[in-house]
Each structure stands twice: as structure tokens, then as C-alpha cells.
Amino acid sequence: MIAYIHGKLLEATDKSCIILTPGGVGYELFLTLSAISTLPESGSDVTFYVHSVIREDAFDLYGFPCFDDREVFRTLISVDRLGPKKALAILSQFGPKDLQDLVFREDVKTLSIVPGIGPKSARQILWSLKDKMETLKSATVRSGACPVEGDRSEFLDALSGLRNLGYGDDEVRDFLKDIFDEEPDLDAGGAIRVALKKISQNK
């Protein structure tokens, strides 16, 4: 089972990337939106912790920039009827600390913004995660070691805000990445304002 990959970034889409290892083998990894948004240029060295999902008709690999994000992912998929695709969608919206806060507050409404998760499913997920809070807490304490550029929560809040304004992820993700690279301490509101200005200048 593949647990860790180091190689060069070959290609990337809005859902996955292909890593070329020194042995000449290319692996496709499914990533969270935050991981996709912080990928370097093609040809750059990258490293991911990996969770492998093996089925009769598929062999899917899910990549995470740090060990603790992978452990939170594994905690999520241990919830009954919560598969890897939905778990990845949750981590695309919420980091470990955000997720811990949702569980503590039993915030069904906020979790329900994740595509494919309605109020009933959100309530079941939050209830199930209450028994797994220690794992989430441990990951939250150590998650500062994750090599993610800028503040992930602010990035995702800005991305969500621009979606609400009618912009697609593909339209704004590169703008936001550049904005947070230049000003990593910027909050979501400031990033949205800068992004809107850049978008208008590029029309």
C-alpha cells in the first residue's frame, strides 16, 4: 500500500495532480482544494502523504501535504457511510481546527454547505465525530507543521465568498493563490476585494 510519495509535479487539474517519481512511474493523487491551490509550478519537487483506496474496479490515491491532514481524512472515512470523495469535499471546506469547532458546536447548517452533504447526513457525521474528538484535537495541535501557503481558512473563506458572487473556482483560484503568496496575513474580505480588482483588470 502506498503511504508516501515524493517526485516532480507533472500535471494538475482542479481535482487532482500527477506526480512523476524518480523511477519513472506517474501517480494520480486526488487532493483537497487547498492543496490544489498551493501546488507549485510543473516540474517542481512535491511530497504527499497518501491514503490508498483499493476496490475491484479502481485504485484511488488521496494525497495530503502533511501527516495530520491524512489522519483527519482517515477519521472522517471511519464514519458510517462517509466515503473518501465526501471526506475530501469536507476537508476542502474545513481544516482540522474548523472541523473540530463544527463538532463542538454541532453546527449542522455550516457542514451542510459541503456539496453532497445534506442536513440529515451532516447531523449524523457530527454525532459520529463526537466519539473521535481526540484524533481531531491531536491533528489540530500539530497542523501548524503542514506546508500550506498562507492561511487555509482565509483562503477557503475567500474562495467561498467569490463562489457566492457567481465566480467559478477555475476563474479565481489562481488569483487567490497569488494574492495570499504576496500577502499571507490578508484576511478573506481583503483577499476578495483584491481578487475582484484583479478580475476586473483582466477583462
From Swiss-Prot:
<feature type="region of interest" description="Flexible linker">
    <location>
        <begin position="145"/>
        <end position="155"/>
    </location>
</feature>
<dbReference type="GO" id="GO:0000400">
    <property type="term" value="F:four-way junction DNA binding"/>
</dbReference>
<dbReference type="GO" id="GO:0048476">
    <property type="term" value="C:Holliday junction resolvase complex"/>
</dbReference>
<dbReference type="GO" id="GO:0009379">
    <property type="term" value="C:Holliday junction helicase complex"/>
</dbReference>
<keyword id="KW-0963">Cytoplasm</keyword>
<dbReference type="GO" id="GO:0006281">
    <property type="term" value="P:DNA repair"/>
</dbReference>
<keyword id="KW-0233">DNA recombination</keyword>
<feature type="region of interest" description="Domain II">
    <location>
        <begin position="66"/>
        <end position="144"/>
    </location>
</feature>
<keyword id="KW-0238">DNA-binding</keyword>
<dbReference type="GO" id="GO:0009378">
    <property type="term" value="F:four-way junction helicase activity"/>
</dbReference>
<feature type="region of interest" description="Domain III">
    <location>
        <begin position="155"/>
        <end position="203"/>
    </location>
</feature>
<dbReference type="Pfam" id="PF14520">
    <property type="entry name" value="HHH_5"/>
</dbReference>
<dbReference type="InterPro" id="IPR036267">
    <property type="entry name" value="RuvA_C_sf"/>
</dbReference>
<dbReference type="Pfam" id="PF01330">
    <property type="entry name" value="RuvA_N"/>
</dbReference>
<dbReference type="InterPro" id="IPR003583">
    <property type="entry name" value="Hlx-hairpin-Hlx_DNA-bd_motif"/>
</dbReference>
<dbReference type="InterPro" id="IPR011114">
    <property type="entry name" value="RuvA_C"/>
</dbReference>
<dbReference type="GO" id="GO:0005737">
    <property type="term" value="C:cytoplasm"/>
</dbReference>
<comment type="subunit">
    <text>Homotetramer. Forms an RuvA(8)-RuvB(12)-Holliday junction (HJ) complex. HJ DNA is sandwiched between 2 RuvA tetramers; dsDNA enters through RuvA and exits via RuvB. An RuvB hexamer assembles on each DNA strand where it exits the tetramer. Each RuvB hexamer is contacted by two RuvA subunits (via domain III) on 2 adjacent RuvB subunits; this complex drives branch migration. In the full resolvosome a probable DNA-RuvA(4)-RuvB(12)-RuvC(2) complex forms which resolves the HJ.</text>
</comment>
<protein>
    <recommendedName>
        <fullName>Holliday junction branch migration complex subunit RuvA</fullName>
    </recommendedName>
</protein>
<comment type="similarity">
    <text>Belongs to the RuvA family.</text>
</comment>
<comment type="function">
    <text>The RuvA-RuvB-RuvC complex processes Holliday junction (HJ) DNA during genetic recombination and DNA repair, while the RuvA-RuvB complex plays an important role in the rescue of blocked DNA replication forks via replication fork reversal (RFR). RuvA specifically binds to HJ cruciform DNA, conferring on it an open structure. The RuvB hexamer acts as an ATP-dependent pump, pulling dsDNA into and through the RuvAB complex. HJ branch migration allows RuvC to scan DNA until it finds its consensus sequence, where it cleaves and resolves the cruciform DNA.</text>
</comment>
<dbReference type="GO" id="GO:0006310">
    <property type="term" value="P:DNA recombination"/>
</dbReference>
<dbReference type="InterPro" id="IPR012340">
    <property type="entry name" value="NA-bd_OB-fold"/>
</dbReference>
<keyword id="KW-0227">DNA damage</keyword>
<dbReference type="InterPro" id="IPR000085">
    <property type="entry name" value="RuvA"/>
</dbReference>
<feature type="region of interest" description="Domain I">
    <location>
        <begin position="1"/>
        <end position="65"/>
    </location>
</feature>
<dbReference type="GO" id="GO:0005524">
    <property type="term" value="F:ATP binding"/>
</dbReference>
<dbReference type="InterPro" id="IPR013849">
    <property type="entry name" value="DNA_helicase_Holl-junc_RuvA_I"/>
</dbReference>
<dbReference type="InterPro" id="IPR010994">
    <property type="entry name" value="RuvA_2-like"/>
</dbReference>
<keyword id="KW-0234">DNA repair</keyword>
